Amino acid sequence: MAPPAPGAASGGSGEVDELFDVKNAFYIGSYQQCINEAQRVKLSSPDREVERDVFLYRAYIAQRKYGVVLDEIKPSSAPELQAVRMFADYLATENRRDAIVVELDREMSRSVDVTNTTFLLMAASVYFHDQNPDAALRTLHQGDSLECMAMTIQILLKLDRLDLARKELKKMQDQDEDATLTQLATAWVNLAVGGEKLQEAYYIFQELADKCSPTLLLLNGQAACHSAQGRWETAEGVLQEALDKDSGHPETLINLIVLSQHLGKPPEVTNRYLSQLKDAHRTHPFIKEYQAKENDFDRLALQYAPSA
């Protein structure tokens, strides 16, 4: 099924969603477009203005512009915006992360307003970045929004729980099968299923790119489909297009590192991408895991080194 075209979409009640373009841009990873739309759109109520600001500041977080979020969201701001600020604070200040998680645990142990979808999403994001997917899933299961379900699917797929991800996708499709988020989640699940579903996943990423914009998220999705089908050279071309858009994008660089191995590229090519990733994202989980494996290898090598 084709994804929705950009424009004002109607909800089930027939009402036009004034923030459709803002949300759609965010969901496909077109963060600057999301910011531009958010600054341009005229809204009918203060509640919608808060919702707009949530997406505006989340887009700044996605661009790693944490200072904007921390400076502009005040103690007097709405609870939804406080939740966004918490996530920005967690990402921006590494030495405060443990304290932020402790405070979040305290808040989760009290009565949580489950209608505050933004809080659930931001809390789950903190937990997931803190290597606690179980807490993230428990948090998301308290919400029933498409975005909570989409994030649940992402986490389940990272945990290799395709069975549970498919059940969650069915719930999304029952709620709104034409929504951009549902289309993306369908592509993620199809990518995990593999086989003939890979082409279906590719078509979703391609159609969204054609109708909206070929973002880094969509290009990496297309490249993953090509790679899973053994089309390594085609995947490399798509990833190079993504790299042209952002030379420090972590997912693109990680995919190029993996791809270089499959294509038998010289070691210096792989090392170049690895250096770019280290420069831009020194604390990225991939880098931490890579360095841990390097240390393990060095330790093993010492054990088998010839004695003098």
Swiss-Prot record:
Gene, per the UniProt record: COPE
Protein name as it appears in the record: Coatomer subunit epsilon
UniProt record similarity statement: Belongs to the COPE family.
Membrane topology label: Peripheral membrane protein
The protein's role, per its UniProt record: The coatomer is a cytosolic protein complex that binds to dilysine motifs and reversibly associates with Golgi non-clathrin-coated vesicles, which further mediate biosynthetic protein transport from the ER, via the Golgi up to the trans Golgi network. The coatomer complex is required for budding from Golgi membranes, and is essential for the retrograde Golgi-to-ER transport of dilysine-tagged proteins.
Organism: Cricetulus griseus
Quaternary structure and interacting proteins, as annotated: Oligomeric complex that consists of at least the alpha, beta, beta', gamma, delta, epsilon and zeta subunits.
GO MF, one annotated term: structural molecule activity
Major subcellular site: cytoplasm
Keywords: Cytoplasm, Cytoplasmic vesicle, ER-Golgi transport, Golgi apparatus, Membrane, Phosphoprotein, Protein transport, Transport, Ubl conjugation
